[in-house]
Amino acid sequence: MRGEDVQQHTMYSYLSPEERVPANHPLRAIRQITDRILKEMSRLFARMYARRGRPSIPPEKLLRALVLQILYTIRSERMLMEQLNYNLLFRWFVGLNMDEEVWDVTVFTKNRERLLKADVARRFFQLVVKEAEALDLMSDEHFTVDGTLMEACASLKSFKKMDQAEEQKPKSGDDDPGNPTVDFHGEERSNKTHQSTTDAEALLARKGAGKEAKLSYSRHVLMENRNGMVADVDVLPANGTAEREAALGMVASLPGDQPVTLGADKNYDSKQFVAEARELKATPHVAQNNKRRKSAIDGRTTRHPGYKISQQKRKRVEEIFGWMKTVGGMRKLRHRGLQLVGWMFTLTAAAYNLVRIRNLATAIPHGHV
């Protein structure tokens, strides 16, 4: 018998969002881990807010929503609010009831700034790493470091001389006065003399010889070699020396004082970096750069089987950067300023680790999260 296409919808539903989400949905495991971490962060949240006044967006829901935005590659917070309004799965993950009103995007952004000031993303990331360590998913001896550029949320047209008081006037007859045509040919531009009027902390940099120069930030990842989890992250100005500075800083921040190995590509093969890494009790398993010069490491390092393993494992760090670009929405930045960019990059790394924990725990016999 053919069913009727009834257009009259019922006013009430007796099923909760919890009952609608499949028991084996990947977000369930991620939600469990996230809830445990947020419960541990409760005291930090309490210190961030006054005891009196109008209630804000609960920081737990705010952070869940931001994690969801990363996991589902939602391009903007406005689109996130739109999807929270009608997406049942998203409402369940964030903790919104079916009839609960979604926040205004401006209010959401203002509340996020409070989390930024308290460096909540860094604490959240640290607790995610702690969860992975509790499941014995991370090595504390073998690591890989790498860095790359992130294209800033600013165009080259905004890169102007620092002493230029007035905005560049559009040419007469320009068909688009709001986005005037600018000719850069013959103009010498550098970070010493020019600055972006859109994002003053973004610097002009290129990934390599012959590559296009773009306004960028420099992002860095310290990966443990057992399962490719992110052990630490850092974002610095793209000044040309940021890769080595960030690598040494992250190694110095590792807990304990036991010797470790540190895999890296040819960009880290310098006498100064190798010497400073060894001072930090890190054996530099860097790829040798013998082009036009002598490598900073020799057979005393490369002859060991561990060196070859490090060189094989270090390539996995590209999976992290790839995930952050395609899923995490970090191919081109949506935020401005070093602090906010670093905050979002740290939260994206935490989201990546959450996915890895869920996948690895599922693959382990009798694994649990």
Describe each region flagged by the PLM.
Residues 65, 80, 104, 221, ...:
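Hydrophobic, well-ordered secondary-structure elements that form the walls
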Residues 166-169, 176, 181-183, 266-339, ...:
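Helix-centered, glycine/charged polyanion-binding patches within enzymatic domains
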Residues 2-5, 11, 15, 27-137, ...:
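Basic, low-complexity intrinsically disordered segments
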Residues 8-13, 41-45, 106-108, 196-198, ...:
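Short acidic (Asp/Glu) and glycine-rich catalytic loops that position anionic groups and cofactors
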Residues 85, 94-276, 280, 289, ...:
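Polybasic low-complexity intrinsically disordered regions
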Residues 1-36, 180-184, 357-369:
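Charged, often Cys/His-bearing segments associated with DNA-binding zinc-finger transcription factors
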Residues 72-79, 229, 329-333, 352-365:
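Short helix-capping/linker segments at secondary-structure and domain boundaries
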Residues 22, 26, 53-61, 76, ...:
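Secondary-structure capping and boundary motifs in well-ordered enzyme cores
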